[in-house]
Amino acid sequence: LVTMLIQTELGLKSRTTAEQIKKYPLGKVESLFHLRLENGAMQFFTESIDPRYYGHVVLLAPGEMLKIEEDIPMERILEVRREAKRKVFVRNAVRALRQVAPEHELRNIPNVVLVGGSAEDFEIPEMLMQALAEYRIVCGRGNIRGTEGPRNAVATGLLLSYIGNSQEG
């Protein structure tokens, strides 16, 4: 859903580009030796950046830069990406927590642990922390079994439940 919102709002031809915008931070190559990151910081390089990226907004994927072909300002991409994630993840998380909260009151929840792929996103945990801070809810990422990070929470829970039930029966 986030990918679709990004693609539609930015008028992107490629769904893959929208998916990458959702996953990776942005930068703008301002010279052959530096780029401006989406948070305003500058990142400098000792080796020159490929000249094909000069003047373009890029996605900072692990180990590579991905050029965004469309001529869209970095600020606009950032605004659309954050708003899409807020609409989908934050709104749904608050709604779901309200349903399970004692007396349907969020202030009755002391803490929340984020698990799954969304907990590994570079923006979503921070957005949720900001939204839940309003209700004085402490928010953090889970580390499943102390080794898995936030991934495999449901599968691990189901497996442990199955093992526990089979030992009882």
Label each residue range with its predicted role.
Residues 10-16, 21:
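Conserved phosphoryl-transfer catalytic core
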Residues 2-8, 12, 27-169:
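Helical "lid/coupling" subdomains associated with nucleotide-phosphate turnover
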